[in-house]
């Protein structure tokens, strides 16, 4: 079941990430599939009929649709449990329900079984105050990395319920990059454009794999907790990332993770720019591109929440923030709703657009996935 759960969120990771990519754009991209799937689980738990089927199909869920929400919530819970004090990952789910809106006991009980708090709110009379309160909760649960999540007016007197997931991750490298080795260096945004960046350097015994088909190098950078690691996917050519992105699939990413993690450690010189990326998206169009349409329409069947058919999802927002430096990685997200031995060290230079993953080594789920097109942007 654990492998199935990871496959579901990983499918979402690839599909949603791909929907964020604008061909040819020099844009950094980051999202948290684990946060998105957790928020979707809160909706799926109350969905029925076509609405639920669309969510299940988008996630390639082939089991009983009623078990989807439980699987997604269980995966997030397991990922958070497999982290020690040296690498805290914290995930929290909260549902706020308007005072005059009654949810079904069965929905409330399911949420509580996964430690999802259900609170009251007065959206009808004090939507502005409730927006401030909910934004404050998100800020607190992301170590203040995400502020003012819901913009003014997003929640109104018509709001019946707000479903939110917050995810925070801060990992220290198992072997930190030496601060004194960081240098000003050139990052090739394209064949015709270069920018200056702070390039970190690190030489260590690491797991490395070269994908000859995709023409890229992969290296795993473990965090001190060992339960999580970052994986870099660096193309051989300056403009090679577009080809990698166009063929991105669940089987390919799963193969990358398997090949890298089964490789024998070898000496690898890693050059990695410091970077910080923040991205906020209205997920409606992205989710619709994955085939999730019904829950946003007047035909939505969310009768598992309140027993009625007059509910639909009015907004779906996701924000992710990630910062990588010599010490490690700090990231936050919120969602509303086989190698040959070589005598010389291998060298992985992330001095051109590349992809990164932060993965759970226990559940194999993807916490964050991103693209760095220009670290100086």
Curated annotation (Swiss-Prot):
Record site: Reactive bond for chymotrypsin: 342-343
Organism domain of life: Eukaryota
Endpoints of the signal sequence: 1-27
GO molecular function (one): serine-type endopeptidase inhibitor activity
GO cellular component assignments: extracellular space
Glycosylation sites: 301, 361
UniProt-listed PROSITE patterns: SERPIN
Region (RCL): 328-349
Alphabetized InterPro entries for the sequence: Serpin_CS, Serpin_dom, Serpin_fam, Serpin_sf, Serpin_sf_1, Serpin_sf_2
PANTHER family, A to Z: GH10112P-RELATED, SERINE PROTEASE INHIBITOR, SERPIN
Domains: entry comment: The reactive center loop (RCL) extends out from the body of the protein and directs binding to the target protease. The protease cleaves the serpin at the reactive site within the RCL, establishing a covalent linkage between the carboxyl group of the serpin reactive site and the serine hydroxyl of the protease. The resulting inactive serpin-protease complex is highly stable.
Protein's recorded name: Serine protease inhibitor
Species of the source: Cyanea capillata (Lion's mane jellyfish)
